[in-house]
Structures are given as structure tokens and as C-alpha cells.
């Protein structure tokens, strides 16, 4: 199978074995359709060969329907997950597709079924790779819980915040 990985020369399409379901509770194999290139990917590439397939901003086809992929592993049961903070999961650990475990820049990807996000009618799989970066910004706004007239400062030069 083909996959995009960081190499000593930068980035290359390489042949890798089909993905395995190691450490995934309810594994589902998907075929990525569109994968965004994020600043995080550029940092991973800059660190040199990691042996991990790139890409955490992923949309795919599952059972004939387009889906977005929640890229971070989470248990769904710990106190952080129960309050909606899956990114703070104490059980799933820091396992992010494209950074710690294989990402979506490949012919196939194995993800946990709970990481599949069904898309509403009219949202294409091609556009859905932007669900993850949009979710980051929406999550930040929801955490602030702004009200009319409230002053808010956005600090940092990241593209999501801008």
C-alpha cells in the first residue's frame, strides 16, 4: 500500500504494509479521500524520519458514505471524556493519527469506530478534511463561552486562530 512519510530527504510516497488494528478497541478500515496538510505535519517532517504515515486532517469513505475522522484516540469512559474533553483522555493517551500513529495520507487507514464522524447531506468528503481544523476553532470559542460585549484576545499566529 502507498503512504506518505517523512524521510531523510523530506517527504516521499513509500510502500508500507496494510494497516494493523493494534491498540484499537473497535477497528474500522477506511479509504482516505482528502487529507489536509497542517503546520503539525510540517513540524513532523522537519524532525526527520519517524516511521509514521502523515496526516491527521482526514476525510474518508466508510460503507459507501463520506466521513470525517476524529484524529485523537480516546476511551469515551474516563472523566475527561465524559465531560466532552476527549483531547484530555487519561486512557487513550496522546495517540494522534499522523503524529504518534499512522495517519490518513495512505491508501487505507485503521481507526476506532467511535472516531468516525458522519457528515451532513451536502458536505463532500473532499471538504470534510477541514472538519478537524474547524473543530479546533469552534472548541476554543465554546470553551470561552462568549457573550455580547465580551472582549476576547486571540494570542498566537496560528492559522486556526487567525
Q: Which positions does each model-derived feature cover?
A:
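Residues that mark the start of a beta-strand
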Residues: 2, 27-29, 151
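Extracellular beta-rich ligand/substrate-recognition surface
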Residues: 4-11
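Short Gly/Pro-enriched turn/cap motifs at secondary-structure boundaries
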Residues: 6, 19-20, 49-55, 96-101, ...
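Cytochrome P450 core scaffold surrounding the K-helix E-X-X-R motif
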Residues: 40-44
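NAD(P)H dinucleotide-binding glycine-rich loop of Rossmann-like/cofactor-binding domains
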Residues: 77-155
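N-terminal Rossmann-fold NAD(P) dinucleotide-binding loop
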Residues: 161-162
Amino acid at each position: 500500500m502507498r503512504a506518505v512519510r517523512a524521510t531523510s530527504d523530506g517527504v516521499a510516497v513509500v510502500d508500507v504494509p496494510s494497516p494493523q488494528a493494534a491498540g484499537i478497541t473497535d477497528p474500522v478500515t477506511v479509504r482516505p479521500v482528502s487529507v489536509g496538510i497542517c503546520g503539525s505535519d510540517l513540524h513532523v517532517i522537519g524532525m526527520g524520519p519517524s516511521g509514521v504515515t502523515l496526516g491527521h486532517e482526514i476525510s474518508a469513505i466508510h460503507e459507501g458514505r463520506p466521513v470525517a475522522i476524529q484524529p485523537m484516540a480516546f476511551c469515551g469512559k474516563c472523566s475527561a471524556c465524559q465531560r466532552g474533553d476527549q483531547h484530555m483522555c487519561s486512557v487513550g493517551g496522546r495517540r494522534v493519527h499522523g503524529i504518534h500513529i499512522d495517519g490518513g495520507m495512505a491508501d487505507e487507514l485503521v481507526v476506532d469506530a467511535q472516531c468516525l464522524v458522519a457528515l451532513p447531506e451536502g458536505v463532500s468528503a473532499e471538504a470534510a478534511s477541514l472538519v478537524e481544523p474547524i473543530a479546533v476553532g469552534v472548541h476554543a470559542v465554546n470553551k470561552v463561552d462568549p457573550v455580547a460585549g465580551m472582549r476576547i484576545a486571540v494570542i498566537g499566529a496560528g492559522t486556526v486562530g487567525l
